[in-house]
Amino acid sequence: VFVAGGIGITPIMSMLRTLADRGDHRPLTLLYANRTWEGVTFREELEELEQRLNLKVVYVLSAPHESWEGERGRINQALLERYLPRPDRRDSQEVFICGPKPMMDAVEKALVALDVSVGDFHSERFDLV
């Protein structure tokens, strides 16, 4: 499972490209949060990767147009619970997270609340100076 917020998609894209180049067909989920649909980076490439990989991309918009039919709001515990594997299948599942600090903190806290082992999630933190 990959969780990205905004430009935090960049390191996730590198991992997805590598998996595609290797012909990996494990089931993958990407939860990708942005403010608006227009702010979603790599849309076309993500569509291609969905075809090349066994990848489901879930877009989560915090300020979508009224006609948006996808997920709304922020990536929180309830949303993670909907898209993470069942608890009995989580022991072999890893979660990779990259995005703004508040999002990453909230996702990590939610994962702990969902009994995902701290050793099973990996965060890529960066700051703009």
Task: Kindly give the residue locations of the regions a language model identified.
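FNR/FR-type flavoprotein reductase catalytic core
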Residues: 1-129
